[in-house]
């Protein structure tokens, strides 16, 4: 056994948690099971709502956590990646994990990991820390977001959750999850377990059929969200009001059509939880939770005059949803876009979708070996007939976007969650 010296400071702890070796590790749950066994199986002392999906799973997890908290349940929330700081990944009743808990629980998990024959991945270690934290904090229930996929994700070691949720599904991580939406859906639906209730975001028939098949195998009741039962009342930069399945009105603080549709999933999850005895989830609690829900970096309005919106859109499906939401908010008004893209993403398709709404672009090179150079991106955009200004970094990009904008203009930054976090940092420091 290795006698490793305990981590003493938050800086040391965060440095330790930065490693990510999942690409070098064989997929599977064996390492997580062994690690959690060494820690006394904290996951078996908790109740969960488990949430998978390509787009919207983080927003769904955050909105659900807000509703559960406002209903009076002590609620854990586990999400990834973080936007500004690591602590965001683990919250109880909206409060991020404190430094002392993070240091001491990381030491506990690290000491257990050192006793294993195969080192766990960074995400497996983080997930174990989160489970210990939620037990320590005596959570009634945890809103648990899957890291990647579902079936083989380290969060999938939990016993049957109260509700399994599958949010919107698209093509992503195809090398790991499969090259068709149906194969990816099968991986995501791998979180559905006997003894649970499943809720699926209403989408293509092929995905719905995959979910139905898995629920039949596991003998699990399935609810599919029904967009036709959504009645929109109002939508503005101040939020949205709506009814669903004849109930409401509900008020949502978050902007965007896609967030409104994610809310239907949350409401259906609450109905499933109510049927399992979580009877404090009244319509009043749902409304209260939705009207207070925050999910930074997703169609988030950071300032007015000019409006400055940030969004983490990073794939064609997300960009489609973002452009639909911006068109709904701003009508025919053209926007200034601040973005940077990765060469291995379908960047031309994403930018083509943004072109009809663009007054101009300010472009940067993201800090990644896979980044597309800002000058190359600006040249491509200029060739499409739109003004594009290259910027040397995020600070310069924000400055140039604000210089281009008049008081009545709107700026929207998008491209990745990391970039969104950087733009948020620059704007809040100004």
Which stretches of residues belong to each language-model region?
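N-terminal leader/targeting and accessory segments in enzymes
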Residues: 1-55, 59-74, 83-84, 138, ...
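Nucleotide phosphate-binding/pyrophosphate-handling subdomain across enzymes
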Residues: 45, 141-144, 152-165, 169-172, ...
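Hydrophobic alpha-helical packing residues
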Residues: 64-69, 134, 273, 381, ...
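Acidic, Mg2+-coordinating active-site environments of NTP-dependent enzymes
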Residues: 117-118, 138-145, 161-246, 263, ...
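C-terminal helical cap/extension that packs against the catalytic core
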Residues: 201-223, 237-238, 307-310, 316, ...
């Amino acid at each position: 056994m290795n006698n490793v010296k305990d981590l003493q400071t938050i800086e040391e702890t965060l440095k330790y948690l930065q490693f990510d070796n999942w690409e070098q590790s064989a997929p599977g749950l064996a390492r997580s099971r062994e690690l959690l066994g060494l820690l006394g199986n904290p996951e078996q002392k908790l109740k969960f709502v488990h949430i998978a999906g390509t787009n919207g799973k983080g927003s769904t997890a955050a909105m659900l956590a807000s509703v559960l908290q406002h209903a009076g349940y002590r609620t854990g929330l586990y999400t990834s990646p973080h936007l500004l700081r690591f602590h965001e990944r683990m919250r109880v009743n909206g409060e991020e994990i404190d430094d002392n808990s993070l240091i001491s629980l990381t030491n506990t998990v690290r000491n257990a990991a050192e006793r294993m024959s195969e080192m766990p991945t960074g995400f497996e270690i983080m997930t174990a820390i989160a489970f210990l934290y939620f037990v320590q904090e005596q959570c009634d229930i945890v809103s648990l977001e899957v890291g990647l996929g579902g079936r083989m994700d380290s969060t999938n070691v939990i016993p049957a959750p109260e509700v399994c949720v599958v949010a919107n599904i698209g093509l992503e991580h195809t090398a790991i999850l499969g090259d068709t939406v149906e194969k990816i859906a099968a991986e995501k639906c791998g979180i559905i377990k006997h003894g649970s209730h499943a809720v699926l975001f209403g989408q293509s028939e092929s995905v719905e059929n995959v979910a139905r098949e898995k629920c039949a195998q596991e003998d699990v009741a399935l609810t599919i969200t029904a967009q036709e039962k959504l009645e929109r009342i109002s939508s503005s930069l101040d939020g949205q009001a709506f009814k669903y399945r004849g109930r409401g009105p509900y008020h949502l603080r978050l902007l965007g059509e896609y967030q409104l549709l994610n809310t239907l999933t949350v409401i259906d999850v609450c109905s499933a939880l109510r049927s399992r005895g979580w009877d404090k989830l009244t319509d009043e609690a749902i409304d209260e939770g939705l009207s207070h829900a925050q999910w930074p970096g997703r169609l988030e309005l950071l300032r007015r005059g000019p409006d400055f919106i940030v969004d983490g859109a990073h794939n064609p499906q997300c960009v489609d949803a973002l452009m639909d939401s911006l068109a709904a908010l701003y009508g025919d008004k053209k926007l200034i876009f601040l973005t940077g893209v990765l060469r291995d993403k379908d960047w031309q398709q994403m930018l083509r979708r943004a072109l009809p709404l663009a007054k101009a672009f300010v472009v940067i090179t993201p800090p990644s070996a896979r980044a597309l150079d800002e000058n190359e991106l600006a040249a491509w955009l200029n060739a499409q007939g739109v003004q594009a200004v290259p910027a040397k970094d995020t600070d310069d990009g924000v400055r140039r976007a604000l210089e281009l904008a008049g008081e009545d203009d709107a700026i929207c930054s998008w491209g990745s969650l990391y970039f969104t976090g950087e733009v948020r940092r620059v704007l809040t420091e100004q």
